[in-house]
Amino acid sequence: MTQLAIGKPAPLGAHYDGQGVNFTLFSAHAERVELCIFDANGQEHRYDLPGHSGDIWHGYLPDARPGLRYGYRVHGPWQPAEGHRFNPAKLLIDPCARQIDGEFKDNPLLHAGHNEPDYRDNAAIAPKCVVVVDHYDWEDDAPPRTPWGSTIIYEAHVKGLTYLHPEIPVEIRGTYKALGHPVMINYLKQLGITALELLPVAQFASEPRLQRMGLSNYWGYNPVAMFALHPAYACSPETALDEFRDAIKALHKAGIEVILDIVLNHSAELDLDGPLFSLRGIDNRSYYWIREDGDYHNWTGCGNTLNLSHPAVVDYASACLRYWVETCHVDGFRFDLAAVMGRTPEFRQDAPLFTAIQNCPVLSQVKLIAEPWDIAPGGYQVGNFPPLFAEWNDHFRDAARRFWLHYDLPLGAFAGRFAASSDVFKRNGRLPSAAINLVTAHDGFTLRDCVCFNHKHNEANGEENRDGTNNNYSNNHGKEGLGGTLDLVERRRDSIHALLTTLLLSQGTPMLLAGDEHGHSQHGNNNAYCQDNQLTWLDWSQASSGLTAFTAALIHLRKRIPALVENRWWEEGDGNVRWLNRYAQPLSTDEWQNGPKQLQILLSDRFLIAINATLEVTEIVLPAGEWHAIPPFAGEDNPVITAVWQGPAHGLCVFQR
């Protein structure tokens, strides 16, 4: 049998050099590491990794080739109270594997044991890693590098975006390849999108609980191999990487950036009763935050929390991010539950991973977006991330919904959110683009459901409607559910128009949820993470609707307004913004706090947003000048208005002079 040479301790993972494969694995507490190679018949061959440099185990297998399937068995103590759960009976995934062969099924053999180890061997059913070789012709690909001030983000799910698209070939619908199809790219361009933000594409697993209910993890926030693409989104698992890069190359040629939603806060191994796939069996004590009793700190709500203050885990996370940028040319990341990235365990702006990103010449140059919270004490960190990061602005989301969907909100609070929440983000040299403004996202009601449902309807998730937030700030306008009288439909449409206008004409970086622009509904499900069906797949039959045209017109209008694209904080008297009451006069202190929800926002001295969010038709006196309503608010008969606009209830209009 061929013996392993010592090899090199870097880089991490399995790397083919044309003559063989170098294998490396981090484990600070292991006593022995076996590399397990599987031939075409499934026969296993084991080799001890002979090299041990610091905490890195390594070895080199001559004559090994791409396509080789492998895994690890890691020997060490079984001491749960101290956080050690080594079990060499279980085959483990390389955390840096680039491709996985096999499925992560709910099976007792994929568990290591709770208090006592389960020594039943699982190699016959455990997924295997695959050695890959990286040769790809990027041609003249270059990142679009869209300025933050001009960025329009479109959040989408790889499968759900195209699975029902009638103009995309059936054989590629719901795949990476479909993202780069001309039909999809033309749609995004016509809409005005500059950045496609994808829900997780790294290999993930469905939780055992969901599998037992006949459901699956649809969103993908349950990672198991952070360097490997999820194979279900590929036409062929063997070509997944090239399919993904082909799509990115095509999107780049159209000037569209690609941002990946990435999950660095927890793994699919869940709590102590969860499966054993990789990190828990490699070095549980190093990879996770461990309590004094040996259990996990569950700061994510998913059972475990990655210890991103440990130097080796920081190196792992940094290498993962660099891989996606350097190998796949992605343009940025949205970090799920990103407060975990700054835990030491308390949250710090100079936490090790933040510092590593700041100092990296690759990662410091891409777009970085934080979901700025986790569920631990002190986990709400909106506005507190390092200057390189933009952040999801939930203040904006809640204020926009409260203002337009009939909840009490003072004009001052609304204006503050409209002005990029400067009270939150104007610090440490940050710009207005640091505020990622959103009204909806994958997590929560869709925009249409915000105006059709007062309550969540998550029964299909199998948790008796207990899951999902109850703080929706929604308004069904008098009837729970879709459909209704013509008057009801029109009132809901007006609310959708108002929310979209607020989102797309506010200062900050707007993020649009895919499908909101043509009225996609999840029938009141505000936590559709396990619904891989028509509830979440976009119905493109409405894509040519008036709402789609309305949204596109708003985006193109935004790009014409200097105050919104110059990415500078608005200051008193700088000509960027004036806040006026219904009589075209500056608002008084009392009006800001107690006045009716009527407001005029003059941007760049030429564009006027007139707002009447009250229940009554109201005359709005426009500032001096000749004003025209502009698309998408202009009708066929578009006379010059010099004095008064009849503002309908819950209405708004945009004018230009």
UniProtKB/Swiss-Prot annotation:
Residues 460-479 are annotated as: Disordered. Keywords: Carbohydrate metabolism, Glycogen metabolism, Glycosidase, Hydrolase. It comes from the Bacteria. GO terms for biological process: glycogen catabolic process. InterPro entries: GlgX_C, GlgX_Isoamylase_N_E_set, Glyco_hydro_13_cat_dom, Glyco_hydro_13_N, Glyco_hydro_b, Glycogen_debranch_bac, Glycogen_debranch_GlgX, Glycoside_hydrolase_SF. Pathway: Glycan degradation; glycogen degradation. This is Glycogen debranching enzyme. It comes from Escherichia coli O17:K52:H18 (strain UMN026 / ExPEC). The gene is glgX.
